[in-house]
Amino acid sequence: MSEVANEASRRRTFAIISHPDAGKTTLTEKLLLFGGAIQMAGSVKGRKAARHATSDWMALEKERGISVTSSVMQFPYEDKIVNLLDTPGHADFGEDTYRVLTAVDSALMVIDVAKGVEERTIKLMEVCRLRDTPIMTFINKLDREGKDPIELLDEVETVLGIQCAPVTWPIGMGQRLKGVVHLLTGEVHLYEPGRNFTRQDSTIFPSIDAPGLAEKIGAQMLADLRDELELVQGASHPFDLEAYRAGKQTPVFFGSGVNNFGVQPLLDFFVEHAPSPQARSTTGREIAPEENKLTGFVFKIQANMDPQHRDRVAFMRVCSGRFSAGMKTFHVRTGKEMKLANALTFMASDREIAAEAWPGDVIGIHNHGTISIGDTFTEGEAVTFTGIPNFAPELFRRARLRDPLKLKQLQKGLAQLSEEGATQFFRPLTSNDLILGAVGVLQFDVAAYRLKDEYGVEATFEPVSVTTARWVHCSNEKKLEEFREKNALNLALDAAGHLVYLAPTRVNLQLAQERSPDVRFSATREAAHTVSVG
């Protein structure tokens, strides 16, 4: 096996998806704790306390207690290297999450035991479906009262349309929680509350018939457990590796992230069964991870990860070959050579200079506005990875400055923040308005907060008469020019210089489409759809 193939086979790159408040960030922390990446987990609820969750690193996230940008964290576990991409659970940041899901090989879905399958979980699951992403499920907050576990499995199967294969099973819940049974090994892991900040090794009995177990959990509970296990094993699906890898079955685990309980069996199972990096489609051909030449694509851009340095970092998923510090690469969209000096690896916002990276790893590339979401890097081949979209925003606001002298900073701030992809910045052809588009209201708050915090600009966002936006394309230059002249009042350029039609009403958009049949109006733009051939 070549070195590239060997390193690729050790990688496990995944994202955690959930509805807000299902405990995703807490679980992220605990996985890092068990992976030895951090010594003490920062509880996400104790916001006023000094311990902030490692993965919620932007000032605004620390203040509000919600994950707004996806973090990337790497940690070793046993003989594997795990790359964990945390995603925002908040609905307004769905695009960021969507793009993160293009960069992973599998996902972990977190469900709150009391609430079951929630609306955001359904949406994220649809995205995973499009790519047949393998999914494991962690039913969280077992230390609280919740729905009946059999009911929950039924809900996941019915609402999400995926087969469930329970791997661990709870012994009680809430006040009566005693532990979980591992259905594949037969082991019983006892629950011992109150040791939730440091790694704990729970007491393990080899089976439900082990002497001493009845004293620990009570004879009646043990008898009930036997009946329940018989029922569960008769009614549920056994774990099937092929079905899981094809995205048709989800192995299910129960636990309590905040109490570090049930996390270790999940992590052990995950590193053993989750897929290593897979082949990926490009405009030219499929690229296998074990190929010797480096390829990778950018799925996220983050401005100001280090407020002292006003920097922008492009997150690149390595798809094949080996990255080594300072190597020269071919930036496919621009057709230029680019030296990747000082690339970073991440442990949330703790960065280290990457000496090397392998398929499945995510590296950060310093960026001064030359890299866009969806860009592909190779060692010379002109191919582009496909399937990384930009969505048309659904809400629009006009930026209004408190201090007109800070116009330059405002333009720069809006352009840089829009590079991250959660908001989009439009400049109308016929006015000096600066229009920001987003998929949710929270993003305008975030933009205003970050403009003030990171760029020193006080701006407010006010309503503007735009209902929807469409990217405009036409292969006939003359017809496009005519369209521009006739519709100049409704046209704008996005941050990347693409022509966009800003429609005041849906009817207006419909009329424009009918009047210009040669012009293509699209609601999404493939993030790097232009390829320069060197």
Swiss-Prot record:
Chief location category: cytoplasm
Compartments (UniProt record): Cytoplasm
Keyword Nucleus: no
The entry's keywords: Cytoplasm, GTP-binding, Nucleotide-binding, Protein biosynthesis
Ranges annotated as spanning the membrane: none
UniProt entry tagged with the keyword Cytoplasm: yes
Pfam families attached to this UniProt entry: EF-G_D2, GTP_EFTU, RF3_C
SUPFAM superfamilies hit by this protein: EF-G C-terminal domain-like, P-loop containing nucleoside triphosphate hydrolases, Translation proteins
Record-linked InterPro entries: EF-G-like_DII, EFG_III/V, G_TR_CS, P-loop_NTPase, PrfC, RF3_C, RF3_dom_3_sf, RF3_GTP-bd
Entry GO terms, CC: cytosol
Biological process annotations from GO: regulation of translational termination
Binding locations of GTP: 18-25, 86-90, 140-143
The tr-type G domain, residue ranges: 9-278
MF terms in GO: GTP binding; GTPase activity; guanosine tetraphosphate binding; translation release factor activity, codon nonspecific; translation release factor activity, codon specific
Domain of life: Bacteria
PANTHER family for the chain: PEPTIDE CHAIN RELEASE FACTOR RF3
Function, as annotated: Increases the formation of ribosomal termination complexes and stimulates activities of RF-1 and RF-2. It binds guanine nucleotides and has strong preference for UGA stop codons. It may interact directly with the ribosome. The stimulation of RF-1 and RF-2 is significantly reduced by GTP and GDP, but not by GMP.
Family, as annotated: Belongs to the TRAFAC class translation factor GTPase superfamily. Classic translation factor GTPase family. PrfC subfamily.
Designated name of the protein: Peptide chain release factor 3
Record organism: Stenotrophomonas maltophilia (strain K279a)
